[in-house]
């Protein structure tokens, strides 16, 4: 069975069976995807995280299908209906749709019309009709008039019910209808009468009709959401006449009275049973595909957001702006610890501007502030301009930071545990400041669904969404690596091999014993075994470690290789890291062994060139157009700076400094065909856009991307 799985996965993913086998062995041994991708390239043949995850997913699907087959076989055996041919078909089938079609005639059912007819003894009459030789079926039906069967027509009706069920369970019949759906199905949506005003936001779908295969994921998810809210009636249908004709060609073999009875049963089978069954199947399939597309978009956006450029370890002032309630100001040290908080009121209706300036100046000097993070919510533009009009004694950079999800964090258990003595306003301002310092470390504390970069994220399969988002966060955290001495337990949770309990144990050990000076000390952490150490060590950094390799992505299992390189050059490891001239003298082929190949050696040398490098780029300052404050300030043709805030499969939403974001439709991203917006833009990218149209009633702004 395992070898069969390897063959099927290999055919699906175009990856060799050997690579698949080795990868599955590593996963079974408890290795994580980031660890395998980074430190086991020789074993897997250099597979990346996406390929490893695909292997894992395919293997899990096949396992689930194998369990389903076992259940089906047991059920049919219990009925005493298993035959060698049927067993062979089940054994050879690895398509879930075909498998369920095979099982359908044996599947336990509720009391159907066909079952009622069988109980009335009408199955022989149904068999007679299907032979289509009897010239006078009405007369033969009279023999069945007894008990609950009132007359010959009642008997024929029961027989037709049996035939209809047989037709609906026939594999070829189902495939005929399925083929028609796949080729020509049209999805139709209509507004529910009397719900027009309530459904106004779905007005694009009030009279909607489109081939299902051309319906985009965002259209499908919007339609299904409106249907769930009781605002739209939705159906999926092929050409009904063509389907019935094809079915009749299969089942109606005689142009006589029996043939007419069978034709009537076929029509009933299609309308009452087959069409609705296959429609449900295609509704589920199209929803699943739309979910996968929406999740893919969400994952891409989340990855870009998590890997946004950090300001780094600087002393930051965070401001959660507001008008009437004032601006909450916090001051943090370079490690993100809260030093001070207070309110200022520089805006209407309070207008304590002079006092606000004085307070800001004093806090900057008292806490040696190097940068200011302003939340991008209410009063953001006014607060940013207020700060930029001030003259500080030293140069202070002002950044506008997304507040999305900050309120969720400030009311969460994580925030309460971090700041039990402070209210939500302080916690929110701290989160804004920390997002500037290190977006990844702060955003992992927030449910990704609250960050605001998804597309219908509440409508998609929540289990699949959570799995994909968790994998994305894990991938990003391990790609960047974390400082073992400053990382929160929540950030450490995502490190390969750790999880919540070990992460908390590390934080507790750090609190009791002081900062880690060596990766080896991890083995003293309660419940840290050899396997967990192997999985996590390479992703944890210690900036002031005794061994400089402890602040790199070089795994401890490879330290001996670097030490040998240094020894061969007559220098220390620290000198080797410091000198490019020395590193250029290294011939990696000298260090090849049965367990260490060229991929690992290349990674080691790359890491020695830039030890502990951060894959995230440098942070950039951005300014909105000062003349645009509300949607009413916009006009067609206006060119504006903006920041890409969200990407969907139909375009990109751009923050232009007002309450409403503008949409750059897919067709307006470039002067050529674009199938994926991610080819052109990324989250947080600074862009220039042209206003195409403004709908103030619906609060919609259409933009065009201006190529640089």
Give the ranges of each region predicted by the language model.
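Single-stranded RNA-binding regions, centering on S1/OB-family and related RNA-binding modules
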Residues: 542-708
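A glycine-rich phosphate-binding loop feature that marks nucleotide/adenosyl-phosphate handling sites
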Residues: 179-186, 319-323, 377-382, 401-408, ...
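Duplex nucleic acid-engaging cores and interfaces of nucleic-acid transaction enzymes
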Residues: 51-54, 61, 65-75, 79-318, ...
């Amino acid at each position: 069975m395992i070898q069969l799985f390897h063959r099927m996965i290999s055919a699906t993913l175009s990856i060799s069976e050997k690579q698949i086998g080795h990868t599955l062995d590593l996963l079974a041994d408890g290795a994580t995807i980031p660890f395998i991708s980074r430190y086991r390239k020789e074993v897997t043949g250099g597979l990346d995280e996406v390929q490893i995850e695909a292997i894992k997913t395919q293997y899990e699907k096949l396992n689930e299908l194998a369990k389903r087959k076992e259940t089906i076989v047991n059920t049919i055996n219990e009925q005493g209906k298993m035959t060698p041919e049927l067993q062979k078909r089940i054994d050879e089938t690895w398509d879930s749709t075909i498998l369920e079609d095979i099982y359908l005639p044996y599947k336990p059912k509720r009391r159907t019309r066909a079952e009622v007819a069988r109980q009335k003894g009408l199955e022989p009459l149904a068999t007679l009709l299907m032979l289509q030789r009897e010239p006078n079926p009405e007369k033969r039906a009279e023999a069945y008039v007894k008990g609950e069967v009132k007359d010959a027509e009642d008997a024929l009706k029961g027989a037709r019910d049996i035939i209809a069920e047989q037709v609906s369970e026939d594999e070829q019949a189902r495939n005929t209808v399925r083929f028609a759906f796949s080729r020509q199905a049209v999805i139709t949506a209509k507004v529910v009468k009397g719900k027009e005003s309530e459904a106004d936001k779905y007005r694009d779908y009030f009279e909607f009709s489109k081939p299902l295969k051309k319906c985009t994921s965002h259209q499908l998810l919007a339609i299904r959401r409106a249907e769930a809210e009781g605002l739209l009636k939705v159906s999926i249908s092929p050409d009904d006449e063509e389907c019935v004709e094809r079915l009749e060609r299969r089942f109606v073999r005689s142009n006589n009275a029996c043939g007419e009875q069978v034709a009537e049963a076929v029509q009933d089978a299609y309308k009452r049973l087959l069409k609705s069954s296959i429609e449900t199947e295609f509704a589920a399939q199209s929803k699943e595909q739309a979910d996968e597309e929406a999740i893919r978009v969400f994952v891409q956006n989340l990855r870009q957001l998590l890997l946004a450029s950090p300001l780094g370890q600087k002393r930051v002032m965070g401001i959660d702006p507001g008008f009437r309630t004032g601006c909450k100001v916090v001051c943090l040290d370079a490690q993100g610890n809260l030093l001070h908080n207070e309110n200022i009121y520089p805006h209407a209706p309070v207008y304590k501007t002079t006092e606000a300036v004085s307070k800001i100046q004093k806090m900057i000097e008292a806490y040696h502030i190097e940068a200011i993070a302003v939340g991008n919510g209410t009063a953001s533009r006014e607060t940013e301009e207020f700060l930029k009009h001030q003259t500080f004694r030293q140069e202070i950079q002002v950044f506008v930071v997304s507040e999305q999800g900050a309120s969720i964090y400030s009311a969460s258990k994580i925030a309460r545990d971090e700041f039990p003595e402070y209210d939500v306003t302080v916690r929110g301002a701290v989160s804004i400041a920390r997002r500037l310092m290190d977006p990844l470390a702060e955003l992992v504390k927030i449910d990704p669904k609250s960050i605001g970069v998804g597309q219908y994220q509440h409508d998609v399969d929540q289990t699949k969404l959570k799995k994909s988002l968790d994998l994305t966060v894990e991938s990003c955290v391990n790609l960047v690596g974390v400082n073992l001495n400053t990382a929160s337990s929540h950030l450490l949770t995502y490190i390969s091999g750790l999880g919540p309990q070990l992460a908390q144990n590390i934080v507790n050990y750090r609190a009791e014993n002081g900062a880690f000076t060596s990766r080896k000390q991890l083995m003293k952490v309660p419940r840290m075994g050899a396997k967990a150490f192997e999985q996590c060590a390479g992703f944890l950094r210690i900036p002031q470690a005794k061994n400089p390799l402890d602040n790199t992505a070089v795994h401890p299992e490879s330290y001996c290789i670097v030490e040998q390189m240094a020894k061969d050059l007559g220098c220390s490891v620290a000198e080797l890291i410091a000198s490019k001239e020395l590193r250029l003298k290294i011939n990696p082929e000298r260090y090849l062994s049965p367990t260490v190949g060229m991929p690992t050696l290349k990674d080691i040398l790359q890491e020695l060139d830039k030890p502990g490098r951060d894959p995230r780029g440098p942070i950039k300052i951005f300014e909105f157009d000062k003349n645009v404050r509300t949607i009413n300030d916009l006009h067609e043709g206006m060119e504006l700076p903006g920041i890409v805030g969200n990407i969907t499969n139909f375009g990109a939403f751009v923050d232009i400094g007002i309450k409403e974001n503008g949409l750059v439709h897919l067709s307006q991203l470039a002067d050529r065909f674009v199938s994926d917006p991610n080819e052109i833009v990324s989250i947080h990218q600074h862009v220039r856009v042209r206003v195409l149209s403004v709908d103030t009633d619906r609060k919609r702004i259409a933009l065009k991307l201006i190529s640089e």
